[in-house]
Regions:
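Short acidic-aromatic low-complexity motifs
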Residues: 1-30
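A short gly/proline-enriched turn/hairpin at secondary-structure junctions
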Residues: 31-44, 56
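Secondary-structure boundary/capping motif
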Residues: 11, 28-29, 42, 106-111, ...
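Generic anion/oxyanion-binding catalytic loop in active/binding sites
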Residues: 12-13, 38, 100
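Residue-level recognition of oxygen-bearing side chains
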Residues: 19, 48, 123
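Short acidic/polar alpha-helix capping motifs at helix-coil junctions
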Residues: 18, 28-34, 72-76
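A beta-strand edge to alpha-helix "cap/lid" segment located at domain peripheries
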Residues: 2-3, 51-134
């Protein structure tokens, strides 16, 4: 695959992920809390959470997602996946990785639902550097 084709492919994948995040915006309560305890992160409010997620997605070059488990009930959704990507170096606050690292992020998202809206999203994460930059 040429460099141009690879860039186009990566851009399409990122656009699809960004469009997905924007489409799911209304599933969040206006006062939703997003937390990643392992990184000491907390984001509050629907617009801030979506902006935060878009910024994180934009920092993942050539993301490859593997979906591991999904379960939902009226009150909770559990979404477990792994994503491998080259870290752009900005956009994932307090990430234990450096710019240019090829990493695998395993994330379990626990979404608490009330009245059909996500009111709390907790992300349990495990970061692994598969190949350090340089």
């Amino acid at each position: 695959m040429s460099i141009t084709a690879a860039v186009i492919s990566a851009t399409r994948a990122l656009d699809a992920h960004s469009n997905f995040l924007l489409a799911t915006r209304d599933l969040y309560a206006s006062d939703v809390n997003w937390v990643a305890p392992g990184r000491g992160m907390r984001v509050t409010g629907r617009d801030e959470v979506v902006r935060h997620q878009l910024r994180e997605a934009a920092s993942m070059c050539d993301p490859e997602f593997t979906f591991l488990r999904r379960h939902s009930s009226e009150r909770q959704i559990v979404d477990e996946f792994a994503v491998r990507f080259l870290y752009a170096g900005a956009g994932i606050d307090k990430a234990p990785v450096a710019a240019g690292d090829f990493v695998e992020l395993k994330r379990v998202r626990i979404l608490d639902v009330q009245a059909g809206k996500v009111v709390q999203e907790t992300c349990i994460e495990n970061w692994t550097v598969l190949k350090a930059a340089g």
